From Swiss-Prot:
Belongs to the QueC family. This is 7-cyano-7-deazaguanine synthase. Coiled coil: none annotated. It comes from Geobacillus kaustophilus (strain HTA426). The keyword Disulfide bond does not apply. The gene is queC.
Length: 221
């Protein structure tokens, strides 16, 4: 285990909760930071706080409500439908979200004496979001180091994992049932298996079904 301190960018969803469990295995001290960016489902923040409390992780919520003013999107405005037109990004994409989240997380981490930042971005199942790409994360890592003259390391443990592989990692961390029943991924604000209809729920369910099927096949041999 690395005895250094890490900050996890934390939403209370499947991916960031998996990253929180991962970070607790990897680092001597872990904190979680959640951003209030005007998301229409405020329950996300409550879920993040509840999970952090249960895991004994210090949790901070930072106000980034200006993001909803700058970049209208389906995650902050109920009058914008969750959809994806051919050749376009989904309406759930928030311009600059990960750029701002990671930049503010870096400032927060430096003030806490932490070099390590953990985020659940993933290029394998990223819905075309440009700020989930590995090249962006590597570029931002260099920029943050130059901007603050500080040796940050941004960790992306899910970057090259499919959703099924993310569930496998959760299982290996001993957290599958916890993540399955206590996290909030659903765009409609429903904990655990969610609404079953939005893109986030569909991706989550497809990955879980695939992993459980593969696990059952291995165990039956």
């Amino acid at each position: 285990m690395n005895e250094e301190k890490a900050v996890v960018v934390f939403s209370g969803g499947q991916d960031s909760t998996t990253c929180l469990f991962w970070a607790k295995k990897q680092f001597g001290e872990v904190e979680a930071v959640t951003f209030d960016y005007g998301q229409r489902h405020r329950r996300e923040i409550d879920v993040a706080q509840a999970i952090a409390d249960e895991l004994g992780v210090r949790h901070t919520v930072l106000d980034l409500s200006l993001l909803g003013q700058l970049a209208p999107n389906a995650l902050t405005r109920r009058d914008i439908a969750i959809e994806q037109k051919k050749g376009e990004l989904p309406t759930t994409f928030v311009d600059g979200r990960n750029l701002l989240f990671l930049s503010f997380a870096a400032v927060f981490a430096k003030q806490r004496g932490a070099r390590h930042i953990v985020t659940g971005v993933c290029e394998t199942d990223f819905s075309g979001y440009p700020d989930c790409r590995d090249v962006f994360i590597k570029s931002l890592n260099v920029t943050l180091n130059l901007a603050m003259d500080y040796e940050f390391v941004i960790h992306t443990p899910l970057m090259w994992l499919t959703k099924a592989e993310t569930w496998k990692l959760a299982d290996e961390l001993g957290a599958l049932e916890f993540i399955r029943t206590k996290t909030l991924t659903c765009y409609n604000g429903i904990i655990a298996d969610g609404c079953g209809e939005c893109p986030a729920c569909a991706l989550r369910k497809r990955g879980l079904d695939e992993y459980l099927r593969e696990k059952a096949e291995v165990e039956s041999r």
